[in-house]
Amino acid sequence: GQGKDKLVGGRGIIGCDGVSWCFDPGIFIDDDGTTYVTWGGGESNSRPNTDNFDIVKLNDAKDAPVGNGSHVKVNNLPTRKMLEASYIHKHKGTYYFSYSTGWQQGAPTIDYGTSNNVMGPYTWKGTILGDPSMNGRSINGNNNHHGIAEFKGHSYVVYHDRRIAKGHNGLEIIPADDGKAKPNEGYHRSVSVDEMFYNADGTIQTVKVTDEGPAQIENFDPYDWYPALTSSKQKGIRSRSNFVQGKAADHVLLPLSSKESWLRVSGVDFGTAATG
């Protein structure tokens, strides 16, 4: 939703602690309301790619750390090491620390470890998401970022790929803003989502990348108001966000042509009103 609090600008909340890439903050709020932030990536002389993430607990105002940050330890790491995109979520009392592996060891994946303590140490368990591919062909690039959420009894992983920039399965390639006929694939990432499933022992099944995305879990109510961005499929339409400092972002839809531009919603329940 729209943020209401002012951003804390002009200063950091904690140092980088020798981490090479001091970026990709991941925010986790525990059941008791306590907030934690993870960050990091890359590799430095003091922080190799087996020890390149930090975690810190924030105060109640969420604008300063409580104590010093600590290294996120992941035991039993395989050949694929940690690159970036740290993220924590919790499921049935267990903490899951996930991250993107590096392209240096092959196609990047989203791997994870588990712990009974949010600060760790974690034990590596497996891969949540392989390199997004379809029909044996990668639809991604040299990295990935993700988020995990539970919604109405279902678990979902949101991630990025380059399926639109690559024109996967006939998808419409939207021209870059600079007028080029085809954008640079590496810098045009598409946001995708698929359902995620747990095994009985709490481990996560490797997510199947799909064209369709998750199944619809509720009917669409046509008698409510929705942003025009809401659709299950669209053609010839680009969504844009106009950002003005100090104001809420204005989201707009722009047709790419004067005809044959459309959007669709699915699973609509008209009830008895449509038939009288």
Residue ranges and their predicted role:
Residues G1-G276:
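Carbohydrate-active catalytic/glycan-binding domains of CAZyme proteins
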